[in-house]
Amino acid sequence: MEIQFDEPKKSLRPKKVNKFKGRNKKSETRDKFVGVRQRPSGRYVAEIKDTTQNIRMWLGTFETAEEAARAYDEAATLLRGSKTRTNFVTHVSYDSPLASRIRHLLNNRKKGTKQQDMNGISSTTSHADTTNDTTSDGSTSSTTNCIGTASGAINSTSASGVTSTSTNISTSASGVASTSTDISTNSSNTNVNDKSESLLSSSTTMQKPNLFEDAYRPDMSNLTNEYESSSYKSNVSWDFGPIFDNFPFDQWLDMTNNDGLLCDMVDKGVSEFERMKVERQISASLYAINGVQEYMKNVQDCNEAQWNLSPLC
């Protein structure tokens, strides 16, 4: 058997024909002439730019592209010289109305740039002057302030030195015065103390003989006899003879026996001070007698031993 393979039929596609678009008139004119552009209305405009002087100048509107290109060539040669790129080989006539207009525009442009430059320079100079003035004013004020503060410090230091010296002098003077017053007060105190001591010593020396002279001496013979009898009973030997001689028992007994005399003395106008003095002396003598009796009782109660006491002077 024969096997037959059917080959698929190839579909024939039509070849694409590349259609090249022709150049547009606008693009042709734009690429053909330098410095020329066409408006939507169909007219042509010529303008020039100068990057060195930052100038963009509108040269005018023309009906054809060639006229606009020639205007550009004249402006370019006037601005940049004869070696610049132009659309045509042209000879520039300096008396043409385009050349005069270009000169007028260039002069105005140069004046404007100069004016701007002058304004910028004046503004910078004025700003610099103001800054200099402010700095100079600040420096002068600071210098004057420094001078003022320095002078003030000198004056204050001098014044403080004067005041300190004056205060030191015053304090030293006050110290001398205080020392002198202390010395005087000490001397006066010592004088007063000496005087008081002398007065006290004289008063004591004057009072001692008066006390001994005015002391009463009562008669203690009965007491001595009773004491001797009691001492014999207790087998204790006592010797108080000289002691009782020192006490003014005789005068005390005389005063006790003479109470009427005391009343008479009071009636006669004896001063109250003397009466108090006499009463004090009587109380002192009674205290001495009571002390002796208590001492004797204590001695008798202590021991039965014999005591040999030396006479008290």
Curated annotation (Swiss-Prot):
**Broad class of the protein's primary localization:** nucleus
Protein purpose: Transcription factor involved in symbiotic nodule signaling in response to rhizobial Nod factors (NFs). Binds to the GCC box (NF-responsive box) of ENOD11 promoter. Acts as a transcriptional activator of NF-responsive box-containing target gene promoters in root hairs. Involved in early stages of root nodule development. Functions redundantly with ERN1. Is essential with ERN1 for the initiation of root hair infection, and nodule organogenesis and development. Required for accurate expression of the NF signaling genes ENOD11 and ENOD12.
Q: Which PROSITE patterns match?
A: AP2_ERF (PS51032)
**The entry's keywords:** DNA-binding, Nodulation, Nucleus, Transcription, Transcription regulation
List the biased-composition ranges (Basic residues): 11-24
Q: Which GO terms describe its cellular component?
A: nucleus
Spell out the protein name for this chain.
Ethylene-responsive transcription factor ERN2
Q: What is the lineage of its organism?
A: Eukaryota, Viridiplantae, Streptophyta, Embryophyta, Tracheophyta
Q: Which gene encodes it?
A: ERN2
- What do we know about what induces or represses this protein's expression? Induced by Nod factors in root hairs.
GO MF, one example: DNA-binding transcription factor activity
Q: In which tissues is it expressed?
A: Expressed in roots, root hairs and leaves. Expressed in root epidermis and root hairs.
User: PANTHER family of this UniProt entry?
Assistant: ETHYLENE-RESPONSIVE TRANSCRIPTION FACTOR ERN2, SHN SHINE , DNA BINDING / TRANSCRIPTION FACTOR
